[in-house]
Amino acid sequence: MKDNIKNTYLAADFGGGSGRIIAGSLLHGKLELEEVHRFSNRQVKLGNHVYWDFPALFEDMKTGLKLAAQKGYTVKGIGIDTWGVDFGLIDKNGNLLSNPICYRDARTDGMPAKVFKVLDEQQHYTTTGIQVMAINTLFQLYSMKQNRDPQLEIAHQLLFMPDLFSYFLTGIANNEYCIASTSELLDAKRRRSE
């Protein structure tokens, strides 16, 4: 254990292939970083879709928090960073309806062309400021609608991946603006969704 590891902040950094928990402490005027846990993040093909293994990732995050405590860190806060566009749907009782589907899933193939038969593409880009990519949340949701996915009827709330981890860690459901801006659902000027 280090001399002074009070006021430590943890970063939970989830990437497409791996994740890690990093402890950051200001010691004698210098920022000290230590990777306390590293883990793999693999997608799971089940039926016709590719899913993130959210329960396993959440367990790995909790393992990292426990390891930080065992190393003597006094954790003051945690930041959670993941990829954008993917999400989990929460029902009215606070339960996750399904493992989140991975942006690498083929369900959004061809969706931009279908959406832009309904929306004006240029006006949409002017409103959101987000590059059109088939993986974006807008097209994931439209695919679900086109396929009459019953989760859309049951869902009470959509949480983007970092907010989903935060929700299951704290019990507080929020969507942070920066990650929500990756969805192609937000009005960039009004900073909200219509």
Give residue spans per PLM region.
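Carbohydrate-associated surface elements
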Residues: 105
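Gly/Ser-rich phosphate-binding catalytic loop and adjacent alpha/beta segment
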Residues: 108-111, 118, 132-134
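Gly/Ser/Thr-rich active-site cleft segment
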Residues: 14-16, 124-194
